[in-house]
Amino acid sequence: MTQLTDTSLIPFDLLEIQKASFKWFFEEGLIEEIENFSPVIDLRGNFEVHFYLKNYELEAPTFTLEEAKQRDLTYAAQLYIPVELRDLETGIVKQDRIFFGEIPLMTDRCTFLINGVERVIINQIIRSPGIYYSVNTDEQGTRTYDVTIISNRGAWLKFEVDKDDLIWMRIDKTHRLPCHIFLKALNLSESEILSALTHPEFLQKTIYEHGDCTEEEALIEFHRQLRPGEPPNSIQGRYLLYSRFFDPKRYDLGFVGRYKLNKKLNLNVSPNIRILTTQDILEILNYLINLQFGMGQIDDIDHLGNRRVKAVGELLQSQLRIGLNRLERLIHDRLSMLTTKSFKKRKKLTTLINAKPINECLKEFFGSSQLSQFMDQTNPLAELIHKRRLTILGPGGLSRDRAGCAVRDIHPSHYGRICPIETPEGQNAGLVGSLTTHAHLNQYGFIETPFYKVEKGYIQKELGIIYLTADEEDQYRIAAADVLINETNKIIGEDISVRYRQEFITTKIDQIDFIAISPLQTFSVSTSLIPFLEHDDANRALMGSNMQRQAVPLLHAEKPLVGTGLEFQVAKDSRRVLINKSEGLVKRVTGDHICIQTDTGKEINYTLIKYQRSNQDTCITQRPIVFEGERVKKGQILADDTATDKGELALGQNLLVAYMPWEGYNYEDAILINERLVYEDVYTSIHIEKYETETRQTKLGIEEITREIPNVNEYSLRNLDEKGIVSVGSWIKGGDILVGKVAPKAESDQPPEGKLLKAIFGEKNRDVRDTSLRMPSGEKGRIVDVRIFIREFGEMLYPGANTANTIVRIYIAQKRKIQVGDKMAGRHGNKGIISKILPRQDMPYLPDGTPIDIILNPLGVPSRMNVGQVYECLLGWAAEHLGVRFKLIPFDERFGKQASRTFIHEKLKEAKELTNKNWLFNSNHPGKIQLFDGRTGESFDNPIMVGKAYMLKLVHLVDDKIHARSTGPYSLITQQPLGGKAQQGGQRFGEMEVWALEAFGAAYTLQEILTIKSDDMLGRNEALKAIVKGKAIPRPGIPESFKVLMRELQALCLDVVAYKIQNGDQDECEALAIDLSGSLATPIDNIIKEVIQQEELGEELTS
């Protein structure tokens, strides 16, 4: 019997990277950063401030997570630190417990709640601190080497060899200095320097060229190079040298930098020494000189051994460091004003140490950093993938414009660490990636991937999983997981393809060192959910991976007939399903509540999430999947989410699909669907929109929420309660009032009779205007929730809401059925737009009368090379008839040639025999069936491929995109209609569209589009009047954009004027009355008229 390598589920939580990093921040990162900061000494040396961080305290957030979300607040804990202030002259000590800022807390779903919005901190992958040797080749083919020492904090140091074999040293890529001057400035004698080198004669050339010098001369030269404007001085030179490379507060190699330096140069320096030592510098130089003699290796900067991941904890630590630097300056300023006398009087230290700089830094990071993103909550998979994302962008990383192809490319060291498939399609291709399923971060932030040890062809599973980093892996011969093994865990076969030193080679099985633990470990989570992935082209697999994240959760979730086995873990690790905490018996189950009685008799109550709005307006709700009296285990799923089915990820529906053309309706990836999908709510989804209004104190008085709205009939107020707020459960259409609100109107200049009436009858109430919140046009739905916050009742509201007295939030749920224009896709990148919904009687049908659900174009398969959809479709067809579901791990060719095809044929034959439906499988046309036209009842000429495909409805819904405009707002400068649905904009008639009308010869249509339908202000008003009065539309005038062009040319000091030719005499010209400035005639116009009268007719005018 043969079996595969162990393909059990991933051995750890998929969100471990986020959780572990945040935990590290509180246990180590925070303490380390403030210990480096403490003590702060007054510049006069009189006072000293100590921070005792090991005794820090975190106070629980004021509000629960749910309350903070409703009030648009940040879910954060308050940090308090014991502080000690010492007077160094008198020895008096004062202690206090100081508030040190609010630190946002990670929720159990690994997100942060910032101002009521869930956000995710994504992981940044950056060049690791350490040492990098590189080679440069000039046009003549001369090779020169250089070395860069990258620190975690502080200046970059570089040594380079020029084509004359002289060694130079650079600081921060600018200041250049002969290398031996730098060494002499470090107080090293010539004998010490030369004895440390393997080839001392190479450096002697540099010393001979520039001349020897003493330590003092070297320091003077060092100062001259770094501060060219100042008089050179050896004392200042020594201070500059110390502060640049040997002051722990200014220069820090970091834990990782020291590790990389020790590893590359075989040093044994303590990990706690994080500054450069003279031993480091001599070894760095020795290695550089050895490269000139062909000894040693240069470094590949794109290798993952030289790139590390900064997860959330480290990013927070960097941000805290910026805040502490600002705080230090503040403390110095406050200490400079402190005297011994005022110190004795001071009871509290709170005025001395203000948490504002730290708070501002953290707010800035969480609110506006490139690495803090609005969480993608479209479905559970999108949420999970967002937290496992890696980016090269962000502070300290690269920018989109500077990133070349080398950075974006797939590197051999990415194997098992960064997914080669999942990346965005646009500008960010290759810059944003995703961690693979089994990837894991080590203590230094390098990505590791798991393997089993192999001894003499036997897999040593009993030794457990061994994690290797990219540079460790290069030393071994590593086999992929898709090899066959027998029951004794011995690899079958003689010659096996392995990876060795970033190349693929063939080797004997007894020479294999390690084997991958799963074929899925090369890919990210969403790519691992694609069945038959090995049969898809990578470009289409990329689209399939990305589109699964855009799938809208449906009303009735259905798990796929054909999956990969990862669906359960993705659903569980996304934290969107409800997981049982303790073994016991289900005591009570309702729609929103589950009660479990544990074996000890204790009751655990779980409250389900019901109809909550996600960041993308999709619906988050939980459904119980256990029943009363059922025995449940710890870790068992108790309730499903909107996009899970029995605890498995369920993003779409299994549909009966036929690959055939149908009357041209599925041309260019269009899709035909059966009306059954509409009537039976197969693809119906729920979307929840939020609308908000607030009452404010204006100059003219306070706004008021009321039912008494001027000039509004009773029918428009039908859904409002006595307060003027819409009732929960009401059905609302576009234009309906959600919240009745009035604002005071300014008193207009009253006519004399008005003043007389006022004088007789006294002060009358001022007019109010209608400022009600209304439903936008084209929208409809049912009110599911109304929330009111009133300041008088002490409701804490979000920052910035200080001027609001009342805030009303309305949540409206919409049921969106599938319709023409919606986008659908499979898991293999096969996407399309619905072009027609056919009556079920018109759909092609099977020999047993079953109508097809969806018709796809067969031409979408061959050129796209995503044949996986064909395999999935046929295996799903077999699964349907056998009453089973299949879980397949990709790369099954290890079982033999054409393994997928053979397996599917076997299953189809089995289904045929089990159901006695002989038409299910025909060996002459395997996978194809004779279909009949629903309109005529006749069979089609050729057999057609029919099967069960798993299709998703994507978030690009036509309801959100379709838009029409009759009249609307115009741009202030160009006077053209605005663009976009949100601005009630028009359709852009661009350059190419103009060409199309020109080619067609539609002159009048084109003129109307460019003038009265766009920016001819006078013309469009006249046209509207003419349409209203039923008269002929007048001829268009001059578009505003022409006037803008004229003004721009005049701004360049070009006296450009437009003329029109009169209808009478062709030779006579007069200035065209274009009012550019608001006045009819300008001085320049009068001058031109005089010139025209004086000059001879037909003579060319020059201005």
Curated annotation (Swiss-Prot):
A GO BP annotation: DNA-templated transcription
Record key words, sorted: Cyanelle, DNA-directed RNA polymerase, Nucleotidyltransferase, Plastid, Transcription, Transferase
Catalytic activity: RNA(n) + a ribonucleoside 5'-triphosphate = RNA(n+1) + diphosphate
Highest taxon, organism lineage: Eukaryota
PROSITE patterns named among the record's database cross-references: RNA_POL_BETA
GO molecular function: DNA binding; DNA-directed RNA polymerase activity; ribonucleoside binding
UniProt similarity note: Belongs to the RNA polymerase beta chain family.
HAMAP family named in the record: RNApol_bact_RpoB
Protein name stated in the entry: DNA-directed RNA polymerase subunit beta
Natural source organism: Cyanophora paradoxa
